Design a protein with these regions (language model features):
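Short, non-transmembrane amphipathic alpha-helical segments
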Residues: 74-94
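Short small-residue beta-strand/loop micro-motif enriched in glycine and branched aliphatics
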Residues: 63-64, 73-75
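Conserved NTP-handling cores and scaffolds of large molecular machines
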Residues: 31-35, 94, 112
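Short, highly charged C-terminal tails/helix-capping segments
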Residues: 97-112
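Short edge beta-strands and adjacent turn/loop segments
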Residues: 36-68, 103-107
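N-proximal, solvent-exposed amphipathic alpha-helical segments enriched in charged/polar residues
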Residues: 5-52
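Protein-protein interaction and targeting regions used for scaffolding, dimerization, and localization
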Residues: 13, 67-68, 76
């Protein structure tokens, strides 16, 4: 497990990768309840989508969010919306701006 570390005179702040995953998952859940309901999915018949976070030794944070999308949606527009919401929520919670959020589309789901 890696941590984002920020040192100051009083000590250090260490934020676990799990915190960034939790924020991303919470953001995605909210979007799926409201704006992106029936457009974004976290599972298909065979696979569950996951969220990953990596923090390297230089304190660079990368959050990868896997999703399935409805086949009839605008994938670029939807993935940009997801990316922006997650980035904004991470910034609001941590005040860290050096975060990359990657949306990985695992597939498309046809509505029946």
């Amino acid at each position: 497990m890696n941590y984002y570390t920020q040192k100051n005179n009083a000590g250090s702040l260490n934020i676990s990768e799990n915190v960034f995953v939790q924020i991303a998952n919470d953001s995605l859940s909210e979007l799926m309840k409201e704006e992106l309901k029936n457009i974004v999915f976290l599972k298909n018949v065979n696979k569950q989508a996951k969220t990953h976070c990596e923090i390297d030794k230089k304190n660079h944070i990368k959050v990868d969010v896997e999703v399935y999308l409805s086949a009839d949606c605008e994938a670029g527009k939807i993935s940009t919306k997801i990316q922006k919401e997650i980035y904004d929520d991470i910034y609001d919670a941590t005040e860290i701006s050096a975060v990359k959020v990657n949306v990985i589309i695992l597939g498309f789901i046809s509505k029946k």
